[in-house]
Amino acid sequence: ACAATCGTVCYTSSAISSAQAAGYNLYSTNDDVSNYPHEYHNYEGFDFPVSGTYYEFPILKSGKVYTGSSPGADRVIFNDDDELAGVITHTGASGNNFVACT
């Protein structure tokens, strides 16, 4: 089952967890790959279920964990306590904005 759908891409909860874990591991060791994860400022004003400083990390439709190069359109958002805030995408958004995955 899809835990999040970004455009036509279905993400399982395990795929989301894997992306979040990889992103948070880099964040917690003050490391990054191709400038990810980086702080996500929520200019779009999403009503996330957790608070804190947010970070974005790519989630890939291939199911692989992001290790650099093209990040694609989709991002997992987590906070500095490693709590999942949501999954968002550039797909269907104008310019460099994001919309929520459903």
From Swiss-Prot:
Disulfide bonds join C2-C10, C6-C101. It comes from the Eukaryota. Gene3D superfamilies: Microbial ribonucleases. Pfam families: Ribonuclease. Signal peptide: none annotated. The keyword Nuclease applies. Its EC number is 4.6.1.24. Belongs to the ribonuclease N1/T1 family. This is Guanyl-specific ribonuclease Pb1. It comes from Penicillium brevicompactum.
